[in-house]
Amino acid sequence: MSRETIVGREAGTSAALLCAACVAVAGCLGSGADDEPRVIEGDTATIYSSVPRHGVSASTAAEVVAGERRALEERGRRAGGLRIRFRRLPATDARDKAWDPALVAENAHRAADDPAAIAYLGELDYGATAVSLPITNDAGLLQVSPGDGLTSLTQRPPGRPRSGPERYYPTDRRTFVRIGPTDLDEADRLVARLTSADDTKFGLVFDREIYGRELAAQVVERARRAGLTAVASEEYRGQVADIPDIARALADEEPDAVVQLGVAGRGTIPMLVAIDDELPGVPLLASSGILALPQLALPAGPSRIEAFGPALPPEQAGYEAMRLVLDAVAEGGRNRRRVVAAALRLSRRLPEDRVALYRPDAHGRFAKVRR
C-alpha cells in the first residue's frame, strides 16, 4: 500500500467516520450556547466524568477517576463558592470496545442538559472526544480531556486541510482543554526516532479505528517532510488469522524499522511476534495505543520495541484535569463562560513536552524511561 493510499483513502475514511459522527451529533444539538443557562443557580455544581467501564482502557480509566477524586477531595469538594458534586458516566458497555459512540453522546447530552453542570471531564482516549465535544461546546460547557490525543480537536492535522477543529465547535468558541499530548506530538517523536537511527525506510501497521488511521496519516506526512519513506503500510482489521500475511507483506519491502499504530488488544502480541519472526532484529516502534493494556507482557523477541506515550501516568492525568477545572471554577464561579475563559488561560501552565519514551521492563511490561 503506498503513502498516497494511507494519506488519501485511509485518512479519508477516518475523516468520513468522524464527520458522520459529528453530523449525527449535530442533528441533536440545540440552537447554540447563547440559549443555554449561563449561570449556576443554587449552591451546588456538577462535574461529569465520562470514562470506559469495560474494554482495554477500563483499568486506565479507574486510575484516571481515582486522580480526579483525589483532586476533588483535596479541595473539600468545593470551588468558587460552590459545593461540587461528582458524577461518573460509562463511555462503553462492551468489553471489546475502547469507547461506544452512542454512550459518549448520551453522556455529553446528560451534562449539557444539566443546568447545574459546570464542567465535563472526557473523553479518555482514541478519538471519542470527536463525538462529545460538539455537544458540550453547544452548551458552552467546559470540557477537559485527561488523555484524548486526536490532533484535529485543537489544530489542523498535517496533510489534511479540510479536517480542522472548527467542526467540533458549533458556537465558534473554544471550550476544550487537553492534559496529555496530541497524536501529532507522538508522530513527531516517532519520526525523530526513525531519523536519529537513520531508518530511512519504514513499514507501518495500523488498526481500522479512527485513532490508528489518523495517526498513520500524520506519521507518513511528517516522515515525508523529514526525507523518510513509508515503503509498506498494512491495516490490521482485528482478524488474528490475517497477521501472518501482514507480517510477510511488511517483510517483503525490507524496511529499516516497523512502526505499530493501534490500540492494544488480543492481536498485539501475535502481531509483534509475527513481525519479529519475519524481520528479526529490525527496530520496532509504537504509539501510545500499545500502552492501553498495562498487563500486556511481551515475549523476549519483540521486547526491543520502544513506544511513545503520555508523560503523565493516568492517575496524575486525572488529578491535573480535575485540578484545572477546580481552579477555573474558583476564578469563574457560577458563570460557565468565565469558567471556560479561566480554564483556557490556566492551560498555559501545562508543560509543552507531554510525551515520554516507554520500554518493556524485565517482565515484558512497558515502563516509562526516566530522563
Predicted regions and their residues:
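C-terminal motif of bacterial Sec signal peptides marking the signal peptidase cleavage site
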Residues: 25-27
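Bacterial signal peptide processing site
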Residues: 29-32
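Extracytoplasmic "Venus flytrap"
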Residues: 36-69, 79, 89-99, 208, ...
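Extracellular/periplasmic periplasmic-binding protein-like sensory domains
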Residues: 268-320, 330-333, 365-368
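Beta-alpha junction/loop-to-helix N-cap segments that form part of ligand/metal-binding clefts
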Residues: 35, 59-63, 78-162, 236-241, ...
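Bacterial N-terminal signal peptides that target proteins for export
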Residues: 2-18
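Segments of small-molecule ligand-sensing domains
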Residues: 315-370
